[in-house]
UniProtKB/Swiss-Prot annotation:
The keyword Thylakoid applies. A 7-bladed beta-propeller torus, about 54 by 55 Angstroms, with a depth of about 25 Angstroms and a central pore. Disulfide bonds: none annotated. This is Photosystem II stability/assembly factor HCF136, chloroplastic. Its main location: plastid. The lineage of its organism: Eukaryota, Viridiplantae, Streptophyta, Embryophyta, Tracheophyta. The keyword Transmembrane does not apply. Essential for photosystem II (PSII) biogenesis; required for assembly of an early intermediate in PSII assembly that includes D2 (psbD) and cytochrome b559. Belongs to the Ycf48 family. GO terms for biological process: photosynthesis. It comes from the Eukaryota. One of its GO terms (cellular component) is chloroplast thylakoid lumen.
Amino acid sequence: EDSLSDWERVYLPIDPGVVL
């Protein structure tokens, strides 16, 4: 899912399980 902006990728946790 490349819908996230560059800053969003840095802001969100690295673990996808935490984001979803």
